[in-house]
Amino acid sequence: MKVIGIVGMPASGKGEASRIARDLGIPVVVMGDAIRERVKEAGLPPTDANFGAIAGKLRADLGMDAIARITIPRIEATGAPVALVDGIRGDYEVATFRDHFPDFTLIGIDSSFTTRYRRLKNRGRSDDSLTPEELRARDERELGWGLGRALEQADCRVTNEASLEEFAAEIRALLCRLGGREE
């Protein structure tokens, strides 16, 4: 099974890359879904603070790769020859995926703080940071989980600063090449 991982800072374009993968017929497993489920089970409101607290507790209790280990059966359950995993947050998760899936490729998505903040203001998800300070705090939390080190391990990098159309074309071409699909 070929597994393509996506890593990037909040609002860098991971969700858009996942949407494009789905459009190409590549199943997508979102690591954050495991966190969202646990927040809901705990009866907590779906806020960035609650998602961060639950994710931090899982990592503290079960290890820094806990969410990757929870996600592996979901990836395998797709039964597809190629799947994409969205939302890698740390180098321990990358190591776990590389160990478990010999054919694993990591795509890093880069986007500036200013661009990411503008996107957050426009997309309106419940876990989105609303102020620059909240985004900086979220960035620091995720960097503390090893997100920067995970980005450094990317097999390929895509910069997402231009138009949505340009980013989509670059991601589509990359996913087609990696997934053995025609563009």
UniProtKB/Swiss-Prot annotation:
SUPFAM superfamilies: P-loop containing nucleoside triphosphate hydrolases
Keyword entries, A-Z: ATP-binding, Nucleotide-binding
Positions of ATP binding: 8-15
Tree of life domain: Archaea
InterPro entries: NTP_hydrolase-rel, P-loop_NTPase
Record bears the keyword Membrane: no
GO molecular function list: ATP binding
PANTHER family referenced in this protein's UniProt entry, alphabetically: DEPHOSPHO-COA KINASE, UPF0200 PROTEIN MJ1399
HAMAP family: UPF0200
Family note: Belongs to the UPF0200 family.
Protein name as catalogued: UPF0200 protein Memar_1556
Protein species of origin: Methanoculleus marisnigri (strain ATCC 35101 / DSM 1498 / JR1)
